[in-house]
Swiss-Prot record:
InterPro entries reported for this sequence: Sld7_C, Sld7_N
Single biological process term from Gene Ontology: DNA replication
SS bond partners: none
Cell membrane as UniProt keyword: no
Domain of life assignment: Eukaryota
Family: Belongs to the SLD7 family.
Organism: Vanderwaltozyma polyspora (strain ATCC 22028 / DSM 70294 / BCRC 21397 / CBS 2163 / NBRC 10782 / NRRL Y-8283 / UCD 57-17) (Kluyveromyces polysporus)
Cleaved signal peptide residues: none
This protein's GO CC annotations: chromosome, centromeric region; cytoplasm; DNA replication preinitiation complex; spindle pole
Localization annotation: Nucleus; Cytoplasm, Cytoskeleton, Spindle pole
The name this protein goes by in its record: Mitochondrial morphogenesis protein SLD7
């Protein structure tokens, strides 16, 4: 046997202030038939109808609602919604056509407290089950218990740590500091390696351009036999001649090898290798 629990009127918020959902009838039927033994007696003894006001909050995926947030009433009863309002019916048909979508309604706490038998649920979630619109009452008592436990644990933690020297870091702080220091060191190493690589690349590019320019001035085209041999000999010998500077460059102890020094070495070697 169905039992009428309440009639709800809902505002849709500022964006749709001109629309009010009326005559949202909340009904209950025990899942085991007409036997009310499993019901919360404070609810099953309702003799008067609760007239409540509520406001739309948001949409939600009903599959993501924790079981411990659902009122025990939800598990032992069929909780279903009826209406004679075409506006209300059209709203539910339109907004609940998506799979697993739920509509969260906040019941006005003052209105609930003033209603017959002090209707206890502040939040209701409406969803579509087949052709029916059903609802889930949300029970926040367990959440409040969790919140109180957390607050108590935080207070205990503060009492335990109070009086300790401020300069001492917690183990988590130490871990974070060590991690940050490690990241900082690694970043510096990477940046230093990049700088060294860029300096060496600049040296190679400068050396290559000087050799090619010197060979071109001497009228030796890259198609001529022996061009590659002279180029490689000059390149390798210049590197050897500046080996000490290159070592310092790799250790980042000097900024760069002066262009004039490289040019002078290349010119000397090209005169030697080309006899010009």
């Amino acid at each position: 046997m169905f039992e009428k629990l309440a009639v709800l009127k809902v505002k849709l918020g500022d964006r749709h202030s001109d629309i009010v959902l009326r005559d949202i009838q909340l009904w209950r039927k025990p899942l085991d038939g007409d036997n009310d033994n499993g019901l919360d007696r404070s609810i099953s003894n309702v003799k008067e109808i609760n007239y409540l006001k509520g406001e739309f909050l948001q949409y939600i995926d009903i599959n993501k609602i924790p079981l411990w947030l659902r009122s025990s009433e939800h598990f032992s009863n069929l909780l279903i919604c009826f209406t004679t309002s075409t506006t209300t019916n059209a709203f539910f048909e339109s907004k609940l056509k998506y799979i697993n979508r739920g509509i969260v309604i906040e019941v006005n706490s003052a209105a609930a407290a003033a209603a017959a038998n002090n209707y206890q649920h502040r939040y209701l979630i409406f969803y579509k089950n087949g052709h029916n619109v059903e609802f889930i009452p949300i029970d926040l008592s367990l959440k409040e218990l969790f919140d109180n436990k957390i607050a108590s644990l935080n207070a205990d933690t503060e009492n335990v740590t109070e009086g300790k020297e401020k300069k001492k870091s917690s183990s988590i702080d130490k871990i974070l500091m060590q991690s940050q220091k490690k990241v900082f060191v690694q970043t510096n190493k990477v940046m230093e390696s990049l700088q060294i690589s860029e300096k060496r690349q600049k040296f190679n590019e400068t050396l290559s351009k000087l050799i090619l320019s010197g060979l071109r001035l001497r009228g030796i085209p890259n198609t001529q036999s022996g061009f590659q041999k002279i180029y490689k000999m000059t390149f390798d010998t210049t590197e050897f001649a500046h080996r000490e500077e290159l070592v310092k460059l790799s250790h980042n102890t000097i900024h760069e090898i002066p262009f004039e020094d490289i040019q002078e070495t290349v010119e000397t070697l090209l005169k030697l290798f080309t006899k010009s």
